[in-house]
Amino acid sequence: LTLGKSLTPFPKDANDFYHITKANDSLFARAACRNWNLKIIDVMQSTVFGVETESTKQINEFTRFDYDEIYGTVLNRFILQASANLPLTIYGGGKQSSGIMVLRDAINVLNKLKDFDIHSGSYQVINNNPKSYKILDLAQKVKNAFDARGKDTVFNTTDFDPRNESKNNSNI
C-alpha cells in the first residue's frame, strides 16, 4: 500500500508483542468498518515525547510520562537516566533511527483530523512521522542538554539489543 511517498506494509507486520497488538488493532478497526459501516481514521504517529500542551499549561495539569528500559519512548528513557545520574544506555550501537515528535505537535495533528471527512464504511490510515533521528544522536542531544546544566552525563553503549534488531535498522 503506497500512501504519498511512503510504502506501508499491508497487512502490517511487527516483530515484538507490543507492535503486534498495534497491528491487530488496525485489523480489528478495518473489520469493524466493513462489518458495521463505521468511519475510522487510524493515526500512526512517531514516538511522542513531552509533557505539556497549550491546554495543560493554562490549567496547570500534567500529562503522563511513559518510559521503559527497552521498548519505545527512547528519548524519555534517556531523560530519566540522565536525571537519575545513570548512564544513557544505547542498545545495538545507536545507529538505528526512530521517529520522534513533540506532544503538542501530535495534538495539533489530531485536532486537524477531527474535521477530516470520510464516508461510512471507510478506514483511513494517516502516517504522522515528521522527523527521524539516530538513537545515538538523541542520546547526544540529551547529554548536551544535561551537561549544559552541570550534570556530567555518560553513555553506556552495548552490542546487546533486547529488540533483536539490525544495528542499522531505520524502521524503529
Regions found by a protein language model. Name each.
Residues 1-3, 55-59, 168-171:
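Short, flexible, mixed-charge acidic loops at enzyme active sites
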Residues 13, 67-71, 131:
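Residue-level signature of the cytosolic catalytic core of signaling kinases
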Residues 6, 46-51, 96-97, 131:
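Active-site pre-Tyr helix/loop in NAD(P)-dependent dehydrogenases
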Residues 25, 71-74, 135, 168:
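Conserved donor sugar-nucleotide recognition element shared by glycan-biosynthetic enzymes
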Residues 82-172:
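C-terminal substrate-binding subdomain of Rossmann-fold SDR/epimerase-dehydratase oxidoreductases
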Residues 1-46, 74-84:
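Active-site Tyr-X1-5-Lys
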Residues 23, 36-38, 48-76, 86, ...:
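Glycine/proline-rich active-site loop of Rossmann-fold NAD(P)-dependent oxidoreductases
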Residues 30, 52-55, 135:
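Short, function-defining helix-loop hinge/capping sites that tune catalysis or transport
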